[in-house]
Amino acid sequence: MTRAGFPLEISDPERIPTARYYDADFYRRECEELWPHVWQMACRVEQVPEVGDWIEYSNLGKSVIIVRTKDGISAYHNACRHRGVPLTEGSHGNCKGKGFICPFHGWRWNIEGKNTFVYGRHMFSEHQLDEQDLALRPCRTEIEMGCVFINFDDDAPSLREQLGPLAVGLDAYNADKMRAEWCFGTVLPANWKVAMEAFMEGYHVMRTHPQLQQKVPILYNMMYGMDTGGIGVPINPNRSMKENIVDQVDHMQLLSEGMAGMCHAKDVAVARTLIDVELPEDPQQAIMHWFGMVNHCVTQAGQARGEPTPDLNRLAVETPVKSVEFIFPNYFLLPFLSSMAAYRIRPLGPESCMFELWSLTHFPEGQEPPVVMEPVMLPYDSDQFPMIPRQDYSNIPLQQKGLHAEGFDFMRLSKVIEGLISNYQRIIDGYIRHEPMDKLSAATQKLAGNFDGPVLDLGF
């Protein structure tokens, strides 16, 4: 039996129809068939620390209030039950005493979502003011990785189920204990999927981030090919072991400066102290031994400062986490040693999106920085962005323009190292086709560790 398709559905997993990145009808399908049924990262837990603290999350015209109650964290659809006006003014605040007050007619709700006041109550029919019906509509929430996630679908599998084994790895990383140092945001003139796919493979490093490939060509050439077409730097077999170690530290320094949060300066400082350590003569064993020492010393240094740094060597063996982990449909974590960068991408239209990035790390208890409540918004070409995302941002708008080229009907992917792009795109198709939720959840689990990975059989 042949499955009935829909326009722009992927038929060849190595070829992605380009109109999926700008077609208005396909964008409408995503808005209607995908986004109402997926887990969306709404805020960080530290943004609502005290009872009554609230923050608004919005996406595709839907607004949700996340609020700290006496019993935990709740979320409500941000609309007055009278005539639909949003209840919040501003993006965040505290309503412990007054609750949520509609700016239109003054109706009021407490932080548990219960209506506490209706002006001119006697003028309304009794059934209009039924207590249960008048309560704010709750929105489903789960807390993972130090973040509050929301889902508009009460029947969707749990976020924990969707994450699968990745949840265990992130737990071991103590991701829930990390705090944001800063957050930047920008609006990119590109489809949200174009913006995300720039971070789903490392194959672009040689050309887009040449400073990284030039520093440790052995790392990138071994993964993507020795012949760099005269653009990248070839491997130099004559470099001494110490020179190679210095290159690794310098590479970390470039990541620290270029990605800020991904490779933290405190970890680079530890690595620098290990440049002159005694190592095995075999180069491959020496590099592995050196990285093991870096893991150990970063762990020890963090714990000595009172930070909840995990045992990085044990983590690498028992619950490994890739350098880029994609959490469907629009959130990334990029762990490196003790810290992480995080990305969230939200659609603003068929060819526009909001891109936010955070620097996350551990702090000793009581020494956490001030809570970051809003991103610092910058133009996408601002030199205030770290170098590496700035280099990526320079390509993204160009790619969006190129997708409209006459005769360019599909993107052609490597089935070996660009599989993550194909895999998550076909999961979007699964939502549009209304595949069973258990199959979608099982397919989504396969995205864990799929960075630079192959095209997979998703089971539908």
Regions found by a protein language model. Name each.
Residues A4-T18, D176:
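Short, contiguous pre-domain boundary segments
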Residues E9, A19-L60:
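Glycine/alanine-rich phosphate-binding loops at beta-alpha junctions
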Residues W35-W39, V85, H204:
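Generic structural signal for secondary-structure transition and capping sites
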Residues A42, L87, N115, L212, ...:
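Short clusters of hydrophobic/aromatic residues that line enzyme substrate/ligand-binding pockets
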Residues Q47-D154, S158-A172:
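Rieske [2Fe-2S] iron-sulfur-binding domain
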